[in-house]
Every structure is written in C-alpha cells, then in structure tokens.
Amino acid sequence: MPRALSIKFDNTYMDLYDELPESKLLYDEEFSYLLDAVRQNGVCVVDFLTLTPKELARLIQRSINEVFRFQQLLVHEYNEKYLEICEKNSISPDNGPECFTTADVAMDELLGGGIFTHGITEIFGESSTGKSQLLMQLALSVQLSEPAGGLGGKCVYITTEGDLPTQRLESMLSSRPAYEKLGITQSNIFTVSCNDLINQEHIINVQLPILLERSKGSIKLVIIDSISHHLRVELQNKSFRESQENKNYLDRMAEKLQILAHDYSLSVVVANQVGDKPLANSPVAHRTYVTDYDYQLGWLVGWKNSTILYRQMNSLLGASSNNDEILSDDEDYMLIERVMSTVNDRNYDFFSKKKPPIIENKTVERNSSSPISRQSKKRKFDYRVPNLGLTWSNHVSTRILLQKSFKASTIIQRGEAHLYKGGDSASFWQVKRTMKVVYSTFAKPGQIAYQITKRGIETA
C-alpha cells in the first residue's frame, strides 16, 4: 500500500490524510512511487498547490507527466471539498433572526425593531454614559412574553468589572409594576464574574456552552460587561507577532460567540470601553486612500462628518495647516459666554476662572485678535474609539454609541440667567445624552436623545 503524502510543518510531518481523509490519491497504486519520492524529498501539499509541474518534477525526480496528473487530481479534490464546505443552506423563517424590545418604543424604532438574535450587538461609550444601565434593562426586557415584545427567555450576565448590581436591578423592577405581574424577576438572570482573562476565556468556551445546552433553548440573551476590560490589560502588543496573535485570539473569541448566538438562537450583547485616537501631528502632508483604515475609521466609530473631514484634511495638508473652519462651533459654550458677559454683578473672566463641566470632545482654539475670534474660540472634534479595533468590529452586527456631553441649561435657553442668584457657572450647563446607531444589519444609522431614570434608559 502506498504511503500517504506528507506535509512538512514546523519540523514535523502531517500526512495528506489529515488534510483530505477521503482522498483517493492516498491509496492509488498509480502514484505509489511518487508518494515515496514526495516523502523522501520533504515536499508538502502546499508545494503541489502552488508550484508548476516542471518545478515539482525537478524536486522529486519524477516524470513531469506523472506529476501533472497527480497535481490535477489533487486540485480537483480540493475544489470539491471547498464547494462542499461553501454549500449554501436555506434558512427558514423560523430559524431567522428575531428581536426583542429595549422597553422603549423610540429606541426600538431606532434599532429597526429592537435587539436581534443570531449576532453580536456592541454598546460602547465613555464611563457614566449608561452602558451597564442599558444592559440590565435588556436583561429584564428579554423576559417579556413575545406578545409583549420580548422573547420569553432567560439571560446570562457575565461581569468583568465587579459583581452584578442587584440593587439597581431591583430598583428598575420596582419602578415598573407591570413587570412583577408578568413574572419578570432577577431569578431569571444567571450571573457570573470573571477576574482575569483566563477565567473569561474558560467561561466563554466551556461553562457558557454547557449552560446553554442544559437550558434547552430557554436562554435568549448573553451579556458581557465589558468585553474588553481584561483584553486590553492582559494582551501584550509589543511586536508584530504579538499583534497578529492578538488578532487571531479576537477572531476566535468573536467566532465562538457568533456560533453560540446562531446555534441557540440568542442575542449576544456586549459593552465595550473606549480609548483615544489622537490627531496626527506630522507636519508632512500625506495622502490617505479610501481603502486605508484611518480613512474609514470615522464612519466605523460614529464620528461627526466635520471631524472626519477635519482629520482627512489634517493628513492631506499637514498638521501645520489651519483647518479650523471645518469644525462646528460649540454654540452652547458661546451662548453662555455671551450671557455671562451681560449678567450684572458677575464681573469676572468666564474663560479663565470658570470652566464648564468636562466636555466630551476635544477642542481647538484659534489665536486671533479679531473681535469675531472670541465667538469662534471653542471648536470640537471627536477622538474616542471603541477598543479591540477592526478585527473585533468585523464580527459586530450592530454597533451602538452612548454619548454624554453638556449643553446650555434651560435657564440660559430661556434668557432667564439674570434670575440666577448663585455664583457657580456650572449651573448654566446640563447633561445631554445621545444614543447613536453607528452601523447595523437591521437599521439605518441614526441617533436619539435619552436620559437615565429609575426605570432605566428612556428616550427624552
């Protein structure tokens, strides 16, 4: 019986049987001597798929016609295997994605119906934007019956930054009396905490699949809060090799979550933290192309169009160029400045002594002696990006951005600042929260204002 064709890999041998166990070439008497020559000369399967018959014949000292016949049969078997793997399977409506409500009608409309199964939904944003609030709200709303907008399912809540805040969940339940009548309780939420990356990996790859298998379809939502907490701390990225290994790790993790979402018809919703994307300070101009990641980044992370154009022009013309006019003015900041300058008995420099609360976006200030420059001093551009990069983004079906910024308070907008008797200008600002669908398989990009209440996340 002829020997199996071997692949040389990292100083070991892996035979053709491992690659194509059903291959008829393994035991074809016609190629027995060729297989012996292949083994003796250390020629691998990849060589047969990439080299010409002439080059192969020289390597193994066999006739070019014999090599050509073997090569053609091997390629044919690989093509058949590829077509078998890529065969399309029709999906019946019963097995397609379903959605459940967020417990807010306006949010559901923004998301194209709600949170969908068979995929990964990412919620990202800075701290105190309400990511965990929304996740806990989903852990309750998924328990609603299908006529009420839910899936009648249970939830698995995986935390990486501490224990699940059960008191906040209880507060949400008590503020929604109808939930108690519908049988929605914390007992339908399985919770587990992981304190390091190894523990997180074990939960996703071992414990979670076992729990889902035993639940027999009763679990409809898996929440991870947050997905990047341990990854960004423990994954080293000091070399190109480590960078590639990290990408492979993220791919495997995301694919595992997608497989679970598909096999068990459930939703995977994760929170993601953010990092900074500084503005390039290179004085040398360089052209960016549509295919460049930096060119596409703004649309993948929810930046404003003015920020995207500003960064592109900064790269094209260099950091020394003045592109401030591209950015939008902070109208609320300028409004408060004008109001403060007219308030009697408030004779202090607003910009030097009184700063507004921390603003979400970085600003650009223009140095000019023109009277108009004082009105155009504050310019905003986006610089926050979700962690884990493009590798992770490619696996996300819906990306939701939660933003927290500040706007002029009602007393300023109504022109009633003169009625305010205090001395703290921070009272002239109020929180502005925005939910933005960056991209989604099920909905168009859009945004809506929201607020955090006792009931959870509600549209303003």
Curated annotation (Swiss-Prot):
Residues bound to ATP: 125-132
Origin superkingdom: Eukaryota
InterPro entries: AAA+_ATPase (IPR003593), DNA_recomb/repair_Rad51_C (IPR013632), P-loop_NTPase (IPR027417), RecA_ATP-bd (IPR020588), XRCC3-like_C (IPR047348)
The protein, known as: DNA repair protein RAD57
Gene symbol of the encoding locus: RAD57
Location within or outside the cell: Nucleus
MF (Gene Ontology): ATP binding; ATP hydrolysis activity; ATP-dependent activity, acting on DNA; ATP-dependent DNA damage sensor activity; DNA strand exchange activity; double-stranded DNA binding; single-stranded DNA binding
Family membership: Belongs to the RecA family.
Keywords: ATP-binding, DNA damage, DNA repair, Meiosis, Nucleotide-binding, Nucleus
A Pfam family it matches: Rad51
Stored SUPFAM superfamilies: P-loop containing nucleoside triphosphate hydrolases
Extra facts: Present with 238 molecules/cell in log phase SD medium.
GO CC annotation: Rad51C-XRCC3 complex
Principal location: nucleus
Job of this protein: Participates in the repair of X-ray-induced damage to DNA and in meiosis. It may act in part by stabilizing a repair complex of other RAD genes.
A Gene Ontology biological process term: telomere maintenance via recombination
